Curated annotation (Swiss-Prot):
Keyword annotations from UniProtKB, A to Z: Disulfide bond, Endoplasmic reticulum, Glycoprotein, Golgi apparatus, Secreted, Signal, Synapse
Gene coding for it: CBLN3
Name of the protein: Cerebellin-3
Tagged with keyword Secreted: yes
Stretch forming the signal peptide: 1-32
Upper lineage: Eukaryota, Metazoa, Chordata, Craniata, Vertebrata
Assembly mode: Heterohexamer; disulfide-linked heterotrimers. Interacts with CBLN1. May also form oligomers with CBLN2 and CBLN4.
Biological function: May be involved in synaptic functions in the CNS.
Gene Ontology process terms (BP): maintenance of synapse structure
GO cellular component terms, A-Z: endoplasmic reticulum; extracellular region; Golgi apparatus; synapse
PROSITE patterns per record: C1Q (PS50871)
PANTHER family registered for this protein in UniProt: CEREBELLIN-3, CEREBELLIN-RELATED
Stretches assigned to the C1q domain: 67-205
Subcellular location: Endoplasmic reticulum; Golgi apparatus, cis-Golgi network; Secreted; Synapse
Length: 205
């Protein structure tokens, strides 16, 4: 039409909107290839949800600001001597009790029985350190899972007065499984808190 003029290039608004739209399309295509979807919030930062990661507050995840589930840890010590136990193999074995509980996160350690009862299913780490009283005496300590011995430690050097029987182990436990220490032989020296028992949850299953 006469008197009509075309203005090219387009005005500033169109020239800015077109590259922005192309950029967003390119980003969306890249995220689609990687299996992620962008979430665009007006006036906010770009949030990307990664595949395979549990949503906050959902199964397997915790909301921001909340403590992770399944925090379990304990540590206990003795403050006095332990009574002698029978020789191994004669059917007698004594439970080792700990009268001072230093840590009991999750409430799994029972001071009355000297046992740890798993509150959640998971992989746990346990460690014990037992010191014998006299030389020329053997100390044998077994870590028990319910009624089964898992590991044992010995201290039997006749020339050493204070020798430690120490061991550690990783165990998968179900809720209600009980872990304790049994003195199979000898005396324990706990007068200066030398004997100890501790454990913690590495990760839940």
């Amino acid at each position: 039409m006469l008197g009509t003029k075309r203005h090219w290039p387009p005005g500033p608004s169109l020239s800015l909107e077109l590259p922005l739209a192309l950029t967003l399309l390119a980003l969306r295509a890249g995220w689609a290839q990687e299996g992620t979807e962008p979430v665009l919030l007006e006036g906010e930062c770009l949030v990307v949800c990664e595949p395979g990661r549990a949503a906050a507050g959902g199964p397997g995840g915790a909301a921001l600001g909340e403590a992770p589930p399944g925090r379990v840890a304990f540590a206990a010590v003795r403050s006095h001597h332990h009574e002698p136990a029978g020789e191994i193999g004669n059917g007698t074995s004594g439970a080792i009790y700990f009268d001072q509980v230093l840590v009991n996160e999750g409430g799994g350690f029972d001071r009355t029985s000297g046992s740890f009862v798993a509150p959640v299913r998971g992989v746990y780490s346990f460690r014990f350190h037992v010191v014998k009283v006299y030389n020329r005496q053997t100390v044998q300590v077994s870590l028990m899972l319910n009624t089964w011995p898992v590991v044992s430690a010995f201290a039997n050097d006749p020339d050493v007065t204070r020798e430690a029987a120490t061991s550690s182990v990783l165990l998968p436990l179900d809720p209600g499984d009980r872990v304790s220490l049994r003195l199979r032989r000898g005396n324990l020296l706990g007068g200066w808190k030398y004997s100890s028992f501790s454990g913690f949850l590495i990760f839940p299953l």
